[in-house]
UniProtKB/Swiss-Prot annotation:
NCBIfam families reported for this sequence: glyS (TIGR00211)
Membrane-spanning intervals of the chain: none
Name by which UniProt lists this protein: Glycine--tRNA ligase beta subunit
Reaction(s) this enzyme catalyzes, per UniProt: tRNA(Gly) + glycine + ATP = glycyl-tRNA(Gly) + AMP + diphosphate
Any single Gene Ontology cellular-component annotation: cytosol
Subcellular localization(s) per the UniProt record: Cytoplasm
Record organism: Rickettsia conorii (strain ATCC VR-613 / Malish 7)
Keyword Cytoplasm: yes
Keywords: Aminoacyl-tRNA synthetase, ATP-binding, Cytoplasm, Ligase, Nucleotide-binding, Protein biosynthesis
Superkingdom: Bacteria
InterPro entries on file: DALR_anticod-bd (IPR008909), Gly-tRNA-synth_bsu (IPR015944), Gly-tRNA-synth_heterodimer (IPR006194)
Length: 664
């Protein structure tokens, strides 16, 4: 069996694209080989500067084969038959026929001779290279090929020999290159084993999994040796794996003068901008140390550490300067600058958004001065120098600036937390922060849907689905008893171009998102039976009804309701129950129970005690069973029949006060 080695050597491939490229090329090569009846074991390795394919168990020759291609029937128009013949370069007389479902069809037998696999591999390889679609790609120079970054070399070896192949301006060879910084030299290779060994000798670790393991082990061991803690950060690990061909973990220190900066600034500078790992003491406090991954092992590691500390110091010096510049102005004084920041082309600027958020907050919690102050100032840090440099610190810098100005902790926390939650796993805000987050998200969602940015099956560029789930979580987990329908109306009316169509669209959107949220814990039929935009109330009902319907009594009662509903059918029952028309004991007893429990159920619903309401409904089970067993509803006397239908209607209406049982 034969072996194929291919390396695409390029300029630096973005780290976040490497894992997808590895999976993508593996799938593409595997599929193309199978389509050509080449059944090989395929591996793909991706690093910062190279994508490598290793295929083993390749046959030396492809087997001859015959493929039958079905053509038109013998009764088809002559033009169709001639077209089929022309496509396969044969005459009609050369085509065999086959009987299929009592109809004769022409067939063409395509014969493929055996070929040496090295003759067809170049074509297959080029097809596979071109088939992968990068999220972004580029042309360079005057060359015609397009790729993620400029390709510099192609290595292609089949069974120890260079496989003749041309890709764009590049001709395949048997050359690769060592580590760019420490061993940047040409390396001639003969096969995969030789290739991998020579790369390793020249400080390139081919396997992504090995580089990742080295980084994780190095981080833990170095942190532990200094009695420090590193928090798990798989996303950052994955990124630095894609930045290093020969990872070495080193420890650096933050100069004391920068420790006056908020820890979030330090963390953002290190993690987001420098790809460094923060370190904490055993009690969880931030420490003035960090770990970083050096791309290569250098003779003077101390020089590498000093270089990284110097780069970090330069960035933190800028941050310190920005911070001092920012605190020279109050959050209030920045409101005017928000007029120059567009929220959305159709929805005005951020100053106008602030006014709407403030109005919504005042509607939700009138006379809450801290909330109104937080609402007015919550976007002011967006025009600060710090947030301009570190966008991920929006809200956080507002929190620190509010504290610096002497605003109380409740206001500062609301400014900090009003962007939460930013995903299903994110923590929720509480107190005034929850109300401000609700107002901000609701205004954004309502405005953007009015502006025509409603999510579609193919996209949700403003993450409105996530915003809606955030609103739902805030309401439920803070148990905010809101008339959400009225709140949506109020928010819609803050926009000039609102309409009933907008209102219906937005309410329908929220209902769908609420169903999505609840369906993790409840059956969809249960949700449909109780859902309305009083979400806290809906949640109480779902809990009570789910528990109730698990019990045998609940199931029997639901069946009784359905039987009553089916008997009524589409009839419109309008008359009141007349007790004087009762002629049997079961209907008298059933009516007495209904009269007894009806006011109690109404009171229980008013108190949101749905478990009690359902337990009261359970007291109908015995009399309603007796009624169905012993009473004929459709009596020969029309008045008695109508009265009994009214009695069943009473039962259904009583059930429907708790939930829409007809949807269960």
């Amino acid at each position: 069996m034969s072996e194929l080695l291919l390396e695409l050597f390029s300029e630096e491939i973005p780290a976040f694209m490497q894992k997808n490229a590895e999976e993508g090329y593996l799938n593409i090569f595997t599929k193309i080989f199978e389509e050509n009846e080449i059944f090989a074991k395929v591996q793909v390795f991706v690093g910062p500067r190279r994508i490598t394919l290793h295929a083993t168990h390749l046959p030396k020759i492809t087997l001859p084969k015959e493929e039958e291609i079905k053509g038109p029937s013998i009764e088809a128009p002559e033009a169709a038959i001639n077209g089929f013949c022309k496509a396969h370069n044969v005459s009609k007389l050369e085509l065999p026929t086959k009987l299929i479902s009592n109809q004769l069809y022409y067939f063409f037998v395509k014969k493929t001779e055996e070929r040496e696999i090295k003759e067809i591999l170049p074509e297959i390889i080029i097809e596979a290279i071109n088939k992968y679609s990068w999220a972004k790609s580029m042309f360079w120079g005057d060359y015609k090929i397009k790729w993620i970054r400029p390709l510099r070399n192609i290595l292609c070896i089949f069974d120890g020999e260079i496989l003749p192949m041309q890709f764009g301006h590049l001709t395949a060879n048997n050359i690769t290159y060592g580590h760019r910084l420490t061993d940047n030299k040409k390396l001639e290779v003969t096969d995969f084993e030789d290739y991998r060994n020579k790369l390793l000798e020249n400080h390139v670790i081919l396997e992504r999994a090995k580089r990742e393991a080295i980084i994780k082990t190095g981080l833990l061991e170095l942190a532990s040796s200094h009695e420090l803690i590193i928090k798990e950060d798989n996303r950052l690990v994955e990124e630095v794996v894609g930045l290093s061909e020969f990872p070495v973990v080193l420890l650096g220190k933050i100069p004391q003068k920068f420790l006056e900066l908020p820890k979030e600034v330090l963390i953002s500078s290190m993690r987001t901008h420098q790809k460094y790992f923060c370190l904490f003491d055993k009690t969880g406090n931030f420490t003035p140390y960090f770990l970083f991954v050096s791309n290569g092992r250098f003779t003077n590691a101390e020089l590498v550490i000093q270089g990284n500390e110097k780069v970090l110091s330069a960035r933190l010096s800028d941050a310190l300067y920005f911070c001092k510049q920012d605190i020279a102005k109050t959050l209030e004084s920045r409101l005017g600058q928000l007029e120059a920041v567009t929220f959305h082309a159709k929805l005005g600027n951020l100053r106008e958004k602030i006014e709407r958020i403030t109005d919504i907050c005042n509607y939700i919690a009138p006379n809450n001065k801290d909330l109104i102050t937080a609402a007015r100032l919550c976007k002011s840090d967006l025009v600060s120098e710090m947030v301009g440099e570190f966008p991920d610190l929006q809200g956080i810098m507002g929190y620190y600036y509010a504290k610096h100005e002497g605003l109380n902790a409740e206001i500062a926390a609301a400014i900090r937390d009003h962007y939460k939650p930013q995903g299903l796993s994110d923590n929720l805000p509480s107190g005034n922060a929850a109300l401000l987050a609700l107002a901000d998200k609701l205004d954004s969602l309502v405005g953007l849907m009015i502006a025509g940015e409603t999510p579609t099956g193919s996209g949700d560029p403003y993450a409105l689905r996530r915003q809606a789930l955030g609103i739902i979580r805030i309401i439920l987990e803070n148990k905010l008893e809101l008339n959400f329908n009225d709140l949506i109306n109020f928010s819609i009316n803050l926009y000039k171009d609102s309409s009933d169509e907008n209102k219906n669209l937005i309410i329908s959107f929220f209902e769908e998102r609420a169903k999505f949220y609840f369906k993790n814990d409840y059956d969809i039929a249960l949700i449909n039976a109780v859902l309305d935009l009083n979400l806290v109330d809906t949640n109480f009902k779902l809990d009570a009804l789910k528990e109730f319907l698990i019990e045998d009594a609940g199931k029997q009662l639901l069946n009784a309701y359905k039987r009553a509903s089916n008997i009524i059918g589409d009839q419109k029952i309008t008359g009141l129950v007349d007790a004087s028309l009762f002629s049997t004991q079961p209907e008298k007893e059933l009516f007495e129970v209904i009269q007894k429990i009806s006011p109690q159920i109404i009171d229980s619903i008013a108190d949101k005690d749905y478990k009690k309401a359902l337990n009261l409904l359970s007291s109908l089970l015995t009399p309603i069973t007796s009624f169905f067993d012993n009473v004929l509803v459709n009596d020969s006397d029309p008045k008695i029949a109508q009265n009994r239908l009214s009695l069943l209607q009473n039962i259904c209406e009583l059930f429907d006060k708790v939930a829409k049982f007809n949807r269960l």
